[in-house]
Amino acid sequence: MAKQYDVLFRLLLIGDSGVGKTCLLCRFTDNEFHSSHISTIGVDFKMKTIEVDGIKVRIQIWDTAGQERYQTITKQYYRRAQGIFLVYDISSERSYQHIMKWVSDVDEYAPEGVQKILIGNKADEEQKRQVGREQGQQLAKEYGMDFYETSACTNLNIKESFTRLTELVLQAHRKELEGLRMRASNELALAELEEEEGKPEGPANSSKTCWC
């Protein structure tokens, strides 16, 4: 039986509540968009397999609650992430200003060398824009991150941003990747993570489908 994937790792979506993290996740994994979602409680996740440079990559994508009361629960997931999206809403200056706080959390709790991309979401809401594209580009430059403006509503840059973060993680794990290519019969889990081990490590749960 052919392998379903070659490598397996985790991506994390973080940012203020209401910036559209769940919408980004659903658009990428299921190609669905719903204008309203119940706020994530704790942590939720979805899986998707994509191919990058001939490598089948199984991605476990975690959607974290942005509310302060869930921060103790969600921060435990930073430690095993290989890639992180830091998301703000272009129609919310407040969510943009809070990116500095989220970066600080990543620096404190995520592993060294974790790959990061800055996302300015809800790009379809141009008439409500409070954060200029140039502001996002400048902030990303300051932190050494790639930057995308996205829209889950119109599907703008959804595939592109997720594919790019996947590429960055693969590049960061080049040695393991070369080992995979030399031993094509062996499966390599970059996150040392089996799917059944993805169960939340605490009382986290979600109003949406998840292991809890």
Swiss-Prot record:
Mg(2+) binds at residues 22, 40, 63. It comes from the Eukaryota. GO terms for biological process: exocytosis; positive regulation of regulated secretory pathway; protein transport; Rab protein signal transduction; receptor-mediated endocytosis. One of its GO terms (cellular component) is perinuclear region of cytoplasm. Its EC number is 3.6.5.2. Its main location: membrane. The keyword Hydrolase applies. Regulated by guanine nucleotide exchange factors (GEFs) which promote the exchange of bound GDP for free GTP. Regulated by GTPase activating proteins (GAPs) which increase the GTP hydrolysis activity. Inhibited by GDP dissociation inhibitors (GDIs). It is a lipid-anchor. A motif (Switch 1) lies at residues 31-45. Keywords: Cell membrane, GTP-binding, Hydrolase, Lipoprotein, Magnesium, Membrane, Metal-binding, Methylation, Nucleotide-binding, Prenylation, Protein transport, Transport. It is found in: Cell membrane. It catalyses: GTP + H2O = GDP + phosphate + H(+). The modification Cysteine methyl ester is found at residue 212. PANTHER family: LD44762P. The small GTPases Rab are key regulators of intracellular membrane trafficking, from the formation of transport vesicles to their fusion with membranes. Rabs cycle between an inactive GDP-bound form and an active GTP-bound form that is able to recruit to membranes different sets of downstream effectors directly responsible for vesicle formation, movement, tethering and fusion. RAB15 may act in concert with RAB3A in regulating aspects of synaptic vesicle membrane flow within the nerve terminal. This is Ras-related protein Rab-15. It comes from Homo sapiens. The lineage of its organism: Eukaryota, Metazoa, Chordata, Craniata, Vertebrata. The gene is RAB15.
